[in-house]
């Protein structure tokens, strides 16, 4: 009874490109994992905006998932307001978005996790690619240069903002057959160079739901 009355620890869980807020519910066992740990899971929709603050009104998806959503859901539900009880995670586009959110709003999150995170560089862009074209990148990030520096700059901003205070814990995982393995290895090395302690794992598999299901279970067990 005492556990039931306590404010719930919370996982904010972000979907990937061309996904939606129901993906995690329908394609993984997140409901069971959350029930076993007695945590709340908040799954917002962000279209294909890469959880970046756009130029037009109503497109501030970065501020939404990093700050506004946290304040809103805490007013609506019986959630813990403790930073240590608040985690953000996601896959692919959502993985990169989760890491970015925790770095830009570190006061809100005790931990952040990305699975198969899409820390895009110009090597992923091609005029023939069905999604990642140079024009697409400019439309989302403003420029290709902004896209390439977005996530590393977020880490640097976190270091400056926290000024010696404890950073959010960071967890990264990617499949060894995933096309994003190279950019995840690069981001892992960057975190090492910056002295950011983090968990990094490479697992058998590709850009696929079985890996993401296993990954989110590990994330929940690690942080809750």
Where do the protein language model's features map onto the residues?
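Non-catalytic cap/lid and distal C-terminal segments of serine-dependent acyl enzymes
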Residues: 1-224
